[in-house]
């Protein structure tokens, strides 16, 4: 009995459970005959893991199946391309483009579109630029309005004729609209209310028609202050030397000076009046 047993069968060796050297086959046969599982198999079953050999076999099977599927697809596509006409094949190729290729083709086909203007943030750009933009918009609106009713806009622009009024000894300036008055008399009364320290001779609405140099001198000597004006030529003239309509068109500014200083303007006023007449 002892002679039948080999020492290798009873020899103890250190190693991992289920593994070993030359006695692996005998140990596997003994385990299969005894019906007991090894330590590694027990752990795999508890963790629901497949043995290493089975996992490798499954991976090989999956790779072979995937390769077979690819070969079948290539054969089918090749047969379709042979049967299809060139336009149909091109259309099929266009249908199977990747998303990146289709986006590139679309971008190349469409013309370049301008970017949408950004919404203006309140308070930016700075105030000066913002005001320039507002003025530009208002100018455009003004042009449109002028195109629609140019006669009305021209009449509105000519409706006012503001001129500055100064007086010798007065520390301030005033401004009057000559279009508000219809004669020299109305303008004289308005100036008297503005500057109560001067008097002015009365002139008719026709200016100095029928007035000679002596009458102008008497007018200047009889008043403490005399209104004068600067015309478009830059000459200082006496108020009342021309008809009212001509005065309104040519007056640039008014000055109320002392009568003694305005005496030298009388001959010049008479000369200019004669030349215009």
From Swiss-Prot:
Residue ranges, annotated region (Disordered): 13-38, 53-119
GO biological process, one term: regulation of DNA-templated transcription
Keywords assigned by UniProt, alphabetized: Auxin signaling pathway, Nucleus, Repressor, Transcription, Transcription regulation
Residue ranges of domain PB1 in the record: 160-259
GN (gene name): IAA30
Record-linked InterPro entries: AUX/IAA_dom, AUX_IAA, PB1-like
Described purpose of this protein according to its UniProt entry: Aux/IAA proteins are short-lived transcriptional factors that function as repressors of early auxin response genes at low auxin concentrations.
Induction of expression: By auxin.
Name used for this protein in its record: Auxin-responsive protein IAA30
Pfam families: AUX_IAA
GO cellular component, one term: nucleus
Superkingdom of source: Eukaryota
Subcellular location: Nucleus
PANTHER family per record: AUXIN-RESPONSIVE PROTEIN IAA16, AUXIN-RESPONSIVE PROTEIN IAA17
Subunit and interaction comment: Homodimers and heterodimers.
Biased composition (Basic and acidic residues): 64-75
UniProt entry tagged with the keyword Hydrolase: no
EAR-like (transcriptional repression), short sequence motif: residues: 12-16
Tissues showing expression: Highly expressed in etiolated seedlings. Expressed in roots and flowers.
Residue stretches of biased makeup (Low complexity): 24-37, 84-94
Disulfide bonds: none
Main location: nucleus
Annotated family: Belongs to the Aux/IAA family.
């Amino acid at each position: 009995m002892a002679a039948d047993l080999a020492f290798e069968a009873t020899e103890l060796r250190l190693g991992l459970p289920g593994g070993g050297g030359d006695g692996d086959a005998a140990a596997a046969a003994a385990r299969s005959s005894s019906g007991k599982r090894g330590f590694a198999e027990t752990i795999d079953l508890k963790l629901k893991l497949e043995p290493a050999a089975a996992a490798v076999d499954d991976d090989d099977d999956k790779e072979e199946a995937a390769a077979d599927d690819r070969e079948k697809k290539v054969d089918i596509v090749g047969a379709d391309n042979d049967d299809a006409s060139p336009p149909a094949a091109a259309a099929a190729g266009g249908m199977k483009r990747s998303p990146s290729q289709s986006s590139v083709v679309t971008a190349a086909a469409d013309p370049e579109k301008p970017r949408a203007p950004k919404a203006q943030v309140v308070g930016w750009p700075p105030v000066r630029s913002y005001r320039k933009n507002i003025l530009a918009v208002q100018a455009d609106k003004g042009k449109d309005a002028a195109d629609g009713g140019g006669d009305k806009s021209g009449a509105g622009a000519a409706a006012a004729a503001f001129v500055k009024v100064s007086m010798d000894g007065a520390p301030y300036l005033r401004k009057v609209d000559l279009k508000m008055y219809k004669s020299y008399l109305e303008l004289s009364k308005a100036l008297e209310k503005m500057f109560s320290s001067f008097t002015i001779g009365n002139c008719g609405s026709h200016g100095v028609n029928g007035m000679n140099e002596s009458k102008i001198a008497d007018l200047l000597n009889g008043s403490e202050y005399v209104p004068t004006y600067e015309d478009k030529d830059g000459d200082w003239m006496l108020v009342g030397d021309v008809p009212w309509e001509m005065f309104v068109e040519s007056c640039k500014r008014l000055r109320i000076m002392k009568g003694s200083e305005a005496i030298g303007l009388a001959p010049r006023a008479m000369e200019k009046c004669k030349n215009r007449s």
